[in-house]
Amino acid sequence: MRLNPYALLAPVLLFGLFAPASTFAQDCKNGTFVDGECVEGYVYVPDFMSPQELKKDIDEHSKDIVIVDTAAPPIWEEEHIPGAVNLPYSKNIAAPAQLSREKTLVVYCACKDDDDSKEVARQLSLLGYRKVKVLKDGWFKWLELKYKTESKG
């Protein structure tokens, strides 16, 4: 008696068709998805840039950076760091089309301990942006140093 190879395959295929989706879902309860893979115990630690470094880049008209302001649009329109684009803080940001993955993104906020900046930077890193920095002490330090600002309009 000869064994039919399809007879062995049938149970596997049937299992695949009728098994609950959770059987195949990747369990990532103790980690974070990074580039589609679960990394257990992943903790994002941001790189920081000082306001002095950022001012130098702005003064030298650096083409290698994009400044990202996490404020709500009306606040950003009122006043922001020169050249900053607006990417409002959100718990789930989508990959913004206007941000280049080739440039260094410098994220800042007007918040205590740079919390919103760190969260947006973390989300951007999870979306595949590899060159992301947080402006140390953010907007308030920028103003304290009396560096230039601009408004939309």
Explain the meaning of each model-derived region.
Residues R2-L9, L14-V66, I75, G153:
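Flexible, polar/low-complexity N-terminal or interdomain linker segments that lie immediately upstream
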Residues P5, F24-V43, D116-K148:
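Thiolate-centered catalytic microenvironments shared by cysteine-dependent enzyme domains
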Residues P20-S22, I81, W139:
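A generic alpha-helix preference that emphasizes hydrophobic side chains
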Residues E40-D113, E119:
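Positively charged, proline/Ser/Thr-rich regional signature most characteristic
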Residues R101-K103, Y147-S151:
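Short, surface-exposed amphipathic charged segments that create phosphate/polyanion-binding patches used
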